[in-house]
């Protein structure tokens, strides 16, 4: 796509060549964008390399952009052949009617997937809680066995042979009160007549 300075210069050249005055050329250049007429099907000319006068007339940002990307504009035909448009033969794109029916099913599928993720996370949390409860109860049982020995020697011997006591750590809840309430309402929602058990 030509830069604004190049496009304006080309429009002024066309207007001056057709015999219009310089003041009328600037006005026609602004309105030419909205004018409907026959589109030119000529391939873009390799005149992207501006003359020194036109290059000096450009603003600094446009000049820098042109100097950086001018090579790519020369190869516009090659780029168009490398990356062809998907619908070259069709002037308009007809949407696929199958996407309309898929769009209707997407929210329920998304909700089911989201519910599945929530259920899986809650199941993992339950398993982790059960493991912690088991280790805590086992540690309590070991300490009770050691306390109930008749002598200190028997208690030390039993303590040496039993596995070490694990201090249970309390896992903080990653959800705050508002998020936990939201998760519980989602899990208790009625979807298709079924209430998801917690």
UniProtKB/Swiss-Prot annotation:
The segments labelled Disordered in the record are: 1-47
Name the chain's protein: Protein LKAAEAR1
Composition-biased stretches, type Gly residues, lie in: 20-30
The highest taxon in the source lineage is: Eukaryota
* Pfam families for this protein: LKAAEAR
Origin species, per record, is: Mus musculus
Q: Which InterPro entries match?
A: LKAAEAR1
